[in-house]
Each structure stands twice: as C-alpha cells, then as structure tokens.
C-alpha cells in the first residue's frame, strides 16, 4: 500500500515528520517497507541566474552560458533551446549526482570549450518526463536550494511517498483513511471526518439493476447511478500528482477518480459507458464458456458459477475484478453508469485465481471492504465526478442490501493486564476504541463495519495494546510460590537430551535434524514400515511412514555427503522414534554414526578406519554424561541390521537394554548406498534410570585406610564362553569384599587345547573393617574359583 504525506494529511491534521509517522506505523503493525523522499535526491541542487549566453563557436545548437551561482560565475555549455540570458535555472555543479541520467557531473570540454556543470531539465531530476528544455523558474534567489523552492511553490514535486506492508487481517489499511485513523488513535494528529452528503438525483436512471436469487450470497448489495453530460478529459493536476506518486499512470478523469477512491477509502468502483450498455444490468452466475475481453485487452473464458455483470448482449464485467473493454470509458464518453457493489471475498478470490487476474479491485475485495460504505462510496465518487467532469446525476438504483455484520463484545478493562501484562486505565482504553471507530454502549463495544478481523474480546485487548504500543511492555518476572534458588527451566528429560547433544558435539560429531517421516523400504530395514506407522496422507511416497529408528536418516545424510566427496563422517541425532501408532509407542533415541577413517591424513602417522570400539567408547561417554550407572554389562544379541559378531548390547542387568553399538550389516549399507563399513551406537535415553533426588547436603567422601589386595586367576574354559560370564561369576563370590574384576589376558591354542581358551582376571579385594589376613584371602580365592568353575565349566589353569 503506497500513499504520499500530503494524501495522508487530507485525512489527518498533523505536524508529525515523515520519520515520526513511519516509526508509528511500524509500531502499529503497519510495517513501513520503503520511504521515497524526492527532497533527498534534490538536496544539493541550487538556483542560478544566466548572466550571459552566446552561440558556441563550433556548434550551432550549443550555447556558452555564464551562470551566476553561490560559488561565483560558472561557464556552462547547454544545448537546450530555451537556454538564454536572464532566466533563473537549476544548477548542477561538478561532483553532483544526476538521478535522471545516473551519472556524476564533472568538468569537461565540449567542442573545445570547457563546461563547469550543467543546467537541469525536469526529467534529469526525475520530476517529470518533460525534457524539451531546462527548468525555468519564475522566482528565486541565486544560491537558494531548489528543494526549498519546490516546497514553497510546487510541493507535490517533493511529496514523500510511504509504502507499507498490509497483513491479511487489516483490509481497512488498504485505504489512506484507514491508515490515518490508526495514527489519530495513536495521537499523531486529529482525524478529518468527511461529511456524508447524498447527491440528489435529477432524473430516473434509464439503466436498472437486478441480482439473481442464486447470486445473492456472493453479491448481496449493488448500487449505481447514471451520470450524463460528463467531460472525460485529463484529471486535475493534484489528482494526477497523487496517482503518479504511488506508481499509477493517469488515464482520464473518470478512471483516475475510481483509482483515487480505491486507494483513498478502500472502495473499488467501476464506470460503464452508459451509451454502450444495452438494456439493464443483471448480476448473475456464468453458465460456463462465455467470453469477455477485459480492460487489460485479454480474452477470458468464464467458468460455471463465476459472478458476472451482463446487459442484454452478454457479460460486460467480471464482478469485483475487472470490467469489460466493450463498455469501457474513452475520451468520447458522455454518459456513464457508476457502480459501487459489495462482493463476497471468497468467491472473488476463487474467480481471480482461476482466471489468473490480479487487479487492485480483486486485491481489496478478497480481503474485505466495508459493506456499509457501498452506498456512501457511490455518493462520494458521484460528487467527485460532478466536480471534475461536470454533468448531472440520476437517482440511485439499488439491488439487495448491505449484509449485517454487526457484532459487539464485552470490554473488560482487567483483561489487558491479564492477557498482555500492560496497565492501561479504563478511560484510556475506552478512548482508544472510540478513536478507532468502535461504538461503546456501557460495557459493550460495537465493532465498526470496516474491521472484519475483530472477532472476540481478546481482539479488543489487542487493539488497546497495539495503540498503546507493545514497545512499552515491561518485563515482569513470573510470581514464584516458593522462595530460594530458581527452579530449572528445563525438565530432567530435556536436560538429559541437551547433555547428550553437548557430549556428542564434544566428541567430534555433527548434529543432524532429519524428518520423522521416511520411505517404507528404509523403515523396513530397521524393523518398521508396517501399517501401524503408515501415514494416512503422506507428503510424498518418500515420507510414507514414521521412522522406527534414527539410523535411516543418518545413513541417508551420510550417503548424500559421500556422493559429494565427503568420505569421513561423524553424525548424530537426538529425537523420537515410533514403533506403533499409539502415543505410548514413542521413544527418544540418541544415535551416532561413524563412516570412513578416524581422522585426516597426517605426517605423524596414517589414520585408521573407524571400528566398533570407537562406537563403544563414544556410547559409554554419552551414557556417563546422561547419568547412566557405571556398572553395565556388554551382551550379545542385537537386531538384524547390526553385523553379527561385531556388535554388543549395553545392558543394566540381563534384560534392561540401554543401548547398542557396533558395525552395521553390509546388507543395510548396500540398500542405502553407503560405501565402506559404518559404525554406530544407539542409546534409548528413556531406559536410562533417572538419578535419585539428593538432599541439599552431600555425604563426606569416604576414603578407606586399609590396604587393598589384588589376586590374579587364570581359567581354561571352552572357546565359546564369554569373558563377561567369568567376570560376573568372580564378582559374585563376595560382593562386600570384591571391589573390581578385570580381564587382562586371553590365550588361545598351544597347550590349552583345541576348542579351549585361557582367560586371566585380576580381582581387587578391598577390606572395610580390618586388614586381610592370609587365611581370609585364601578363603575368598577358593570361593572365586568355585564360582567361576560352576558358571563356566572351566578349570583353574596350572
């Protein structure tokens, strides 16, 4: 929406500057996108007086002028036919930028004679398209600023243009009057209310109007009148200047008046050449297939149900969007029929979209115009036509009636504080709404017809707060029920996820955020892809199922990176996975993926391919960071997408699985186009028990002053016996005394025998109340041997 400062002042009595108005508009929600101030580009130009002018010695059409300026006399070569002695001109001195030519003037020689500047035409200063000669001013002193002369003698030439962005909920701001109303409510001036004086008719209109019954829902109200004896010449200069300033080309008085009403009061109108209309006008729905050449000289084929205005010949206008060329006005037009109607915004939008027509009328009708201004807008436009074009008006013809959108909501002054947090006195709230056009009746606020966005009490609060300025909103801490240390902002689960992200990043991983939707084939590779997780209305076939695991998204990201030459990758993601369609079947995963080598090439040693122990170490680091117990077990038996024999489950006890680490199955990597082996870890953070709540104080560190004792044992067991089985058996011999059990050696072959292996462990004994004696150590050692032999079937190696 564009308008000029002078246009705004037609509706607002204000002394505010352009900057103050722009700041207020943005604060009111009408964001200023651009300000074009002609005074800025004209600030350096000054007035000069041509003291002498003579023919150029080497060019018939050039004159050598001596121009008096504020910096002394300058010799300027000029080719304008009106360059002569005694005139006041606009001087462009060397070093100045000429906007119309897009050059910076400099001292130069023209046909051997030096020129120290130029005298400007209106086109060269972007004041108009006039370039038949240089600017001649009837007044002004040498050295005066040209912009000051324009401000006093021709202010339209330096009228600032403001462009604002209009949100869909504010159609009232598509008229300058609506913008002025907001500024007046803010306190930047006083709104000038235009008097509504109906224009009396001098005769009955020969053209009548009717609306078909099935069209009343889309065209509830139509008004019009015939004006005869008009003269459709150029519009007045003030009207042309205002339209030019906002980028519209003046066409004729009648067209310019309708354009003016569109931007001035958000009231689109249409003017028919009454002598070209045959019979009466009828508003109805198209049957389909009708043709109409519109004012843009394009032919449109109407679809069934579109609203049109027809005479006895056929369609003459696409209702609310664009008129027809056949009944359009020309310079020869003498009698016109002026239309002002209200159209349903949804049907206008559908028709405009189907026909691919973008017009100012469509833009406004599909957002909503004031239904109660239909008749009043007709009267205002009629008066403008009579004032500018002459003629006499008929009585108004009318079909239908304005739809009743009246509504009222209770104004609760306390809700401004509860909803927005601003303390605004009730008297100020009522004054604000009154200035915005609301009618107050006790506690009820009646919404003005031009505000379709006000649909409840909360909207009243928003209007009050908007006019008061949300920039004045002060931060107020939320009340606390208990004093002391502030409660944490994040929940324990959120803190755990945040810590997991920080830890993975510290380990050198890059975070990925992938879609929770994946294709069925990828989901099936990881135990999903069934009907329970299938979307009813997927975005695409590649997003048909909820993901059962984070690994598909990470592997797809890795494949895309490998395709672009990035072979060494460390990626992680924290997010939800879905095993069924019910809310309880959602879990949170922490997953990391390693592909390629452990690091870049280095002169101090070759990098190595990543292996499962890298994934194991990273998984243990993440578990430790999120508070998992230190004593966990590594067991076999992962899912089918893990490489058999090259992965392990991290368990808390024999059944509670906290995570998995290892190498991914080659079949999965091939299906997802991953080159080379890939290591990964997956942690189910929901399975990691939350740490117990601790009190305000911590117990003192307990340091035992008794000497610990370590004993080594070697056992010969079957080759398929896991080391963990042996460790758990040894640790269970005396849980109070045995502090730690570690495997330190494995031997296969030789004297051990076929199908056997030797596992050596170190057992650390830590007494708590007395130093261990030899008999105590021997007793524990005997229990350890018995426990291990019973659990593994092995023997103590001699």
Protein language model regions, located:
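Phosphate-backbone binding interfaces of nucleic-acid-interacting proteins
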Residues: 1-203, 337, 360, 364, ...
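Conserved mixed alpha/beta core segments that line enzyme active sites in large multi-domain catalysts
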Residues: 47-77, 241, 258-326
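Mobile "lid/hinge" segments at catalytic clefts and subdomain interfaces of large enzymes
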Residues: 111-124, 130-136, 143, 156, ...
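Terminal amphipathic helices with adjacent charged low-complexity linkers/tails
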Residues: 183, 187-213, 389-416, 423, ...
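Beta-rich nucleic-acid/ligand-interaction surfaces
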Residues: 39-43, 198-200, 261, 482-485, ...
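A carboxyl-terminal module marker
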Residues: 2, 20, 435-437, 585, ...
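Extended, well-folded interaction surfaces typified by the phenylalanyl-tRNA synthetase beta subunit core
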Residues: 178, 409-572, 764-766, 776-798
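Glycine/proline-enriched, intrinsically flexible loops and inter-domain linkers
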Residues: 5, 23, 28, 63, ...
